[in-house]
Amino acid sequence: VILKDKNILLAVTGSIAIYKSLELIRLFIKAGANVKVILSDGAKKFINPITFEAISQNRVLDESSESWDKSQNYNHIDITKWADILLIAPATANTINKISCGIADNLLLQTVLACKKKIIIAPAANTNMIENPITIQSVNNLKNLGFEVLQTQTKELACKDVGNGAMLEPIDIFHKTCKELLKTSYWENRRAVLSGGGTLEKIDDVRYISNFSSGKMASSLATALYYLGADVTLVSSRGFENIPYEIDLRVSTSSQEMFENLKLALEKKFDKKSFLFMVAAVSDYIPKEKFDGKLKKEKLGETWSLELSKNIDILANLDKKDIFSIGFKAEMDKKEAKSNAQNMLKNKNLDAVCLNILDEVNSFGSDTNKIKLLLKDKSFDFYGNKLNISLEILNRFEKEFTNE
């Protein structure tokens, strides 16, 4: 429920992409938000308003339902006072060009003109219309005025042509809306670099040594950082399929590749002190020799001894000067887990360690996690959905490192 008590006003115009708006409402409500919908007359030609009312659990505002009865407060002025944000999705080229010119000849456009909150526009139009110089000029004008105009995507359009103009997927619009609603001054314009997933160390060209780390915790943490406004780079081997598209993703399979990409990512610095989250499960040992091609079992015989050598300690070898460094440690021995994490905190000169004790409930690949956050002189416990506890952990860091 990351959007608990947030009020989202969704304005829907007449586009074939309207079906995506229904999924978008579902995502917002699942995240705990309150959603109200404004429909243009064109939108109602595609989908009956009752469908939006059933999913949003709120009465639709349109030309026929607008009321100036003060007991209802359901008009284009009052509804903008209720909203925390206004999202127009889909937004046709006609609507975009009218907004740019300040035209308010229907209820939806009047609402836009009356709104003093952040406005996000998700365009949807034929390639020729979205790339028309008039539309391009309108988009640029709206951006200069402070509107957030999202990009479109290239895919098969309603006319069966493949081209630019399709509205972003609902999950991408959801991510962008979450960022606008959740970003904080502490995290905004702050660098955050993360590693994630289990490394894959090649034996030959078809076999490798790895572990069960799914990469989900790193991706959840990267997403939470993005929502809070950070400039995020995720260096990961797996589990990043649903992260926001604006996150800088650097796919890295081997520990050496991960090390090199982390070094490069940490070179980019802002005025605020950066954060490094070492979430990846890096192989402690790697094959001493990497074989070309595929080793044949006929030549290997009944037994096969594979020689391993100790791997580089990425966290110990990265330059962590002027960087908040957070280590992640997975343990199975409950008795020794905390002392092992405390040793990691001290020996690697870290600012914090997130301890994850693995058991039947808290296992690799699950969507929930139980973490003990260890600082130099205190500790905190977190349990729940990985995205939710990521936001809680980051909120704790903001409180603990508030002056830096």
What are these model-predicted stretches?
Residues 1-120, 126-404:
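A cross-family phosphate/adenosyl-ligand binding-site feature
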